[in-house]
Amino acid sequence: MKAKELREKSVEELNTELLNLLREQFNLRMQAASGQLQQSHLLKQVRRDVARVKTLLNEKAGA
């Protein structure tokens, strides 16, 4: 997910996106804990996407 795409979204859409990413992160962590996760790079990717969304939410709150 690109930051440019996220900047075009509203605060409500960003909050929805954040919830979806957190759910996905939880599911990936459960798969990793049970040894079922084949693509371990997804954990890092989702974690960074969560950080991007949170950063944009903070920027929009300050502006």
Swiss-Prot record:
Traits of the deletion mutant: Cells missing both S17 and L29 grow very slowly and have a rather unstable temperature-sensitive phenotype.
Family matches, as Pfam families: Ribosomal_L29
Protease among keywords: no
A GO biological-process term: cytoplasmic translation
Family: Belongs to the universal ribosomal protein uL29 family.
Function summary: Binds 23S rRNA. It is not essential for growth. One of the proteins that surrounds the polypeptide exit tunnel on the outside of the subunit. Contacts trigger factor.
Subunit and interaction comment: Part of the 50s ribosomal subunit. Contacts protein L23, trigger factor and protein nascent chains. Might also contact SecE and probably does contact SecG when the SecYEG translocation complex is docked with the ribosome.
PANTHER family assigned: 60S RIBOSOMAL PROTEIN L35/50S RIBOSOMAL PROTEIN L29, LARGE RIBOSOMAL SUBUNIT PROTEIN UL29C
Entry protein name: Large ribosomal subunit protein uL29
Organism of provenance: Escherichia coli (strain K12)
